[in-house]
């Protein structure tokens, strides 16, 4: 029997209620009680918490369930890897956590100031220039306009392309712009669906240092096939398989299981 068999498979815990704290003082952080199979969320707690997330897609051949009852929590400064083979639902989960897509059912509690998925360029207005997109996002987040433009310009290294409509950008240029704009805002939790891989090795190192060194105090939800990055920076892992998920606090054990999938 392989490790998956010994761990009892990946079916998630039982249906979990959303419960608010009535006790005085600061509420405890949300945790999954493995004995009772319930996740309790205190809505004002400083954490990110998922309760029984389900995601269905309607196809020509019927309903396809991509995620089935996913529950987990991330505390301030904590870094969790999301592992699974291609098609396991990793990117879908990140989009749900970030609010890019709604779940079919379940609850996402966002008690930390959280980024959109890093390098996700789907939120740009294609007909606007790069600079106008930066200014627009800066206004939404209450950031100083000129300072934000300068930070993004310096990091993204797009030069005069920032004056052109985003629809003229390559996918790599859009990713650079989105990555740099994400770093210009003081998020407490970063959603990372694969570390940016455009540009040369110097730019890769620049992205790595900006995210994992300068922002090592931040919480992160990291999807990556680079096990070295996961070993270096993550505290625990969520493994997805066939729509189900399970969180492992022992990262080395989680990586051993992942490599048997």
Language-model features and meaning:
Residues 33, 37-50, 54-73, 79-81:
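A short, flexible loop at the N-terminus of ABC-type nucleotide-binding domains that lies
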Residues 60, 113, 118-201, 209:
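ABC-family P-loop ATPase nucleotide-binding domains
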Residues 79-81, 85-139:
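ABC ATPase nucleotide-binding domain signature region
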Residues 204-216:
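Helical segment within the ABC ATPase nucleotide-binding domain
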Residues 217-223, 226-232:
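Conserved H-loop
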Residues 232-239:
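Conserved catalytic segment of ABC-fold P-loop ATPases
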Residues 244-261:
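Conserved beta-strand-loop-alpha-helix hinge in the C-terminal portion
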């Amino acid at each position: 029997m392989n490790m998956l068999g010994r761990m009892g498979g990946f079916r998630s815990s039982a249906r979990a209620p959303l419960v608010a704290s009535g006790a005085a003082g600061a509420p405890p952080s949300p945790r999954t009680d493995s004995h009772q199979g319930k996740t309790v969320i205190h809505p004002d707690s400083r954490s990110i918490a998922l309760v029984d997330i389900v995601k269905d897609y309607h196809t020509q051949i019927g309903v396809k369930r991509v995620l089935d009852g996913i529950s987990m929590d991330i505390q301030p400064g904590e870094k969790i890897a999301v592992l699974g083979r291609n098609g396991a639902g990793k990117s879908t989960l990140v989009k749900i956590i970030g609010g890019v897509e709604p779940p079919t059912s379940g609850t996402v509690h966002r008690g930390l100031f959280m980024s959109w998925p890093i390098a996700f360029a789907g939120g740009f207005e294609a007909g606007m220039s790069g600079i106008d997109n930066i200014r627009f996002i800066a206004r939404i987040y209450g950031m100083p306009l000129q300072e934000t433009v300068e930070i993004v310009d310096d990091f993204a290294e797009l030069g005069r392309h920032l004056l052109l409509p985003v629809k003229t950008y390559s996918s790599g240029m859009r990713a650079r712009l989105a990555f740099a704009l994400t770093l210009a805002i003081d998020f407490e939790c970063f959603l990372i669906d694969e570390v940016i891989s455009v540009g040369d090795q110097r730019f890769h190192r620049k992205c790595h240092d900006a995210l994992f060194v300068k922002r090592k105090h931040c919480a992160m939800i990291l999807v990556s096939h680079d096990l070295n990055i996961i070993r270096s920076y993550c505290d625990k892992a969520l493994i997805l398989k066939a729509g189900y998920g399970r969180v492992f606090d022992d990262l080395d054990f989680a990586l051993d299981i992942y490599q048997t999938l």
